[in-house]
Amino acid sequence: MSVALDVKNNSVEKTKVLVRGTITPGNIVFQKELDVNAHTTEQVKFDKRYFPQLCIDQPRLWWPNGYGDPNLYHCKFEVMVDGRVSETKDVSFGIKKYSYDKEGNTFHIYINDIPVFVKGANWGMSEYMLRCRGAEYDTKVRLHKEMNFNMIRNWLGSVTDDEFYEACDKYGIMVWMIFG
């Protein structure tokens, strides 16, 4: 697994920062120290080649609704300056293998090497115009789960809020992005 995030220095001078991440479950800790020039943004990358703790043996896999639990990991990032926490960010994510083929002129989707029969609905401009936020996404995506759906087609990529994707991850709903 690899992880990347942007660190922005809003100060007028170069600043030494420590970026630390903790992934649970597993209590996987990784950190890197770097200098960030004044008024710049630096991308910090953590790669399993240099941070072997990012190789998760026997991970709890994320599954679409109807195929298993949508297991999620949580990563807490801390950016520290002079030994004090300057900024934090929490991120949830699932670990899965996605593949597809078009054998026999039919599109097949596989999650974790298992064929998935896609059942879902379209979200488009009308849902975007409803201006869902926060808990509203959770409720609407949960209803898709309860209808035994496992995919939402995000027509024209019109829904872009983090809360939408977080709810989909939580309930095992795959997102099919359709643009133009």
Kindly give the residue locations of the regions a language model identified.
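N-terminal catalytic cores of secreted or lumenal carbohydrate-active enzymes
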Residues: 156-180
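Secreted/periplasmic carbohydrate-active enzymes, especially glycoside hydrolases
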Residues: 1-155, 159, 170-171
